[in-house]
Regions:
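Hydrophobic "lid"/C-terminal helical patch
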Residues: 23, 64, 120, 171, ...
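Glycine-rich NAD(P)-binding loop of Rossmann-like domains
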Residues: 1-22
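Aromatic pocket-lining residues of Rossmann-like dinucleotide-binding sites
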Residues: 26-27
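Short beta-strand "acidic-cap" motif of Rossmann-like dinucleotide-binding folds
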Residues: 34-36, 129
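C-terminal helix-to-coil terminal segments
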Residues: 2, 87, 134-195
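Rossmann-like adenosine-cofactor binding region
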Residues: 41-143
Length: 195
């Protein structure tokens, strides 16, 4: 049985915040080509991280055999990863033998799970791993859980002692900053402060 190497393979990161940039650093160390789609990201930040910033999400899917999702769930991102986009992935074309792979540890609902199952069955996607689902908890009878090329975990990606300690420390720091009358660095919806 032969596998394929990650070195030289294109990794597409949907969203390019702190976590995605950390994933990019590890993937780059393994020799992967780093691509991202983030409509809010300045090109300068992508360049500083050695990533190619795609202006259109379809371009990311056309280029990358590996997709990792790192964006928030919103009306804009609901079912962002769907049958149409998974069919664009290049892993079955032009003699590329590595296949196509999707990972979502961000939020359930970004991946259309019915479309993902169909893509796994028709070969557009070779393997997928989700830590988050549109309806949680996902059960053992969930159709994706029954597919041999699917790996699912019950939203436990951050369930380590160290991660939980960091979360507690980050929350305490944000509360203290707010009590000092300042805006916490980790605030994600600053636009609502003025309302």
């Amino acid at each position: 049985m032969n596998g394929t190497e990650l070195s030289g393979k294109p990794l597409g990161l949907i969203g390019f915040g702190r976590i995605a940039q950390g994933v990019a650093a590890v993937a780059k160390a393994m020799g992967m080509q780093i691509h991202t789609y983030d409509p809010y990201l300045p090109v300068k930040i992508a360049r500083q991280q050695g990533a190619f910033l795609h202006k259109k999400i379809d371009s990311l899917f056309e280029t990358c055999t590996h997709i990792s999702i790192h964006c928030n769930l919103s009306d804009e991102t609901h079912h962002l990863v769907n049958a149409k986009r998974m069919a664009l992935m290049p892993g079955k074309a032009n003699g590329i033998a590595c296949g196509n792979h999707i990972v979502n540890c961000a939020r359930g609902g970004i991946v259309n799970e019915d479309d993902l199952l169909e893509a796994l069955e028709n070969g557009n996607v070779t393997s997928a791993a989700l830590d988050v689902f549109e309806i949680e908890p996902a059960t053992n009878g969930h159709p994706l859980m029954l597919h041999p090329n699917f790996h699912g975990t019950p939203h436990i990606g951050a369930a380590t002692l160290e991660a939980q300690q960091r979360v507690g420390t980050d929350i305490a720091a944000a509360v203290m900053t707010t009590l000092d009358g300042k805006v916490a660095e980790t605030l994600v919806n600053k636009e609502f402060l003025s309302s």
